[in-house]
Regions:
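Glycine-rich beta-strand-centered segment in the early N-terminal region that forms part
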Residues: 19-33, 48-108, 142-144
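NAD(P)H dinucleotide-binding glycine-rich loop of Rossmann-like/cofactor-binding domains
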Residues: 58-75, 80, 102-177
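Local beta-strand N-terminus motif with an aromatic residue
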Residues: 128, 171, 216, 238-239
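Mid-domain Rossmann-like dinucleotide-binding core that forms the NAD(H)/NADP(H) cofactor-binding site
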Residues: 145-224
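Glycine-rich phosphate-binding loop and adjacent beta-alpha segment
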Residues: 217, 249-286
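Short amphipathic alpha-helix with an adjacent loop that forms part of the alpha/beta core around
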Residues: 225-237
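Short SAM/SAH-binding signature in class I
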Residues: 237-243, 263
């Protein structure tokens, strides 16, 4: 099958062997797959991610649920925002059948442990024609929902998870820094919960327009106006929760310096590089 293969931190389109479903697994045809910012970061800064992952694993007790680490010298197919159609089933599959359209948590498990789909040498992601998924983790796509929209399930889930972890309440306000897919997912979930005001910040006019459509009360171009200034003009009183959804060095420090006293900051963007913050900023703004 054809696939976009990453090897030694380089990407190429190549022919690779078709995967085969094992017990409890299904073979699927990829209908749509998004390009996540973390995939782009991995190409540029994956070595830092691997080194940090190995260091943390060595410092923690063994965990059978920790995904196995990929080897960059071996071929790997990225892509974890996908929608697929089942084309074949492995032994023990009793719910799914060929023709079913599904999305899934980007993880697979077998006798050797847990693997991160799209970050695994064994389980190719959605930048390929075919994928193997575990039936247990697959979710049926409602009839009539286009595949490209269904593929947004994973980034939407990341945004919803961030909002849940923030413990934001009806008496709080929110700033979302970065209005890519995950930042927009945060906006949508905040609006669904009735949080307000919500201020979004991004350099892209198109993304700012999407954020307004999804429920932002105010959007700003950070090159022209600080997000916190917009919050002060609209409200300036309610406790503030800041969602950092950019994931590049310097953003966390910028968020800490921007946020007023008593604010909470949620790290949503995936920064794979070392970063630096000034702890005294946080202490002074407690």
């Amino acid at each position: 099958m054809r696939a976009a293969v990453m090897q030694d931190w380089e990407l190429r389109v190549d022919d690779i062997a078709e995967p085969e479903p094992g017990p409890g697994q299904v073979l699927t045809k990829v209908l749509a797959c998004g390009i996540c910012g973390s995939d782009l970061h991995l190409l540029r800064h994956g070595e830092e991610l691997r080194r940090l992952t190995e260091e943390l694993a060595a410092e923690e007790p063994p965990d059978p649920l920790r995904p196995r680490l990929f080897e960059p010298a071996s071929p790997m197919v990225m892509g974890h925002e996908f929608c697929c159609e089942v084309v074949d089933t492995g032994p023990g599959v009793d719910r799914l059948e060929p023709g079913d359209v599904v999305v899934s948590m980007p993880a697979a498990f077998d006798a050797d442990g847990v693997h991160a789909v799209g970050f695994s040498n064994r389980y190719p992601g959605g930048y390929a024609e075919l994928m193997v998924l575990n039936e247990l983790l697959a979710i049926d796509v409602p009839a009539g929902l286009p595949a490209d929209l269904a593929a947004l399930t994973e980034p939407l889930a990341v945004g919803v998870h961030a909002v849940v972890k923030s413990r934001i309440s009806a008496g709080d306000a929110a700033i979302v820094l970065g209005l890519g897919p995950v930042g927009l997912a945060c906006v949508a979930e905040l609006a669904r919960l009735g949080i307000g005001p919500i201020v979004g910040a991004d350099f892209s006019p198109r993304r700012r327009a999407l954020a307004e459509h999804l429920g932002c009360h105010e959007v700003v171009d950070p090159a022209e106006r600080p997000a916190v200034a917009a919050w002060r003009e609209i409200d300036g009183v309610r406790p503030l929760v800041v969602f950092e959804a950019v994931g590049v060095p310097g953003m966390l420090d910028a968020a800490m310096r921007m946020a007023p006293k008593g604010s909470r900051i949620l790290v949503v963007g995936v920064c794979m590089q070392p970063d630096q913050v000034q702890p005294m900023v946080g202490i002074g703004r407690e």
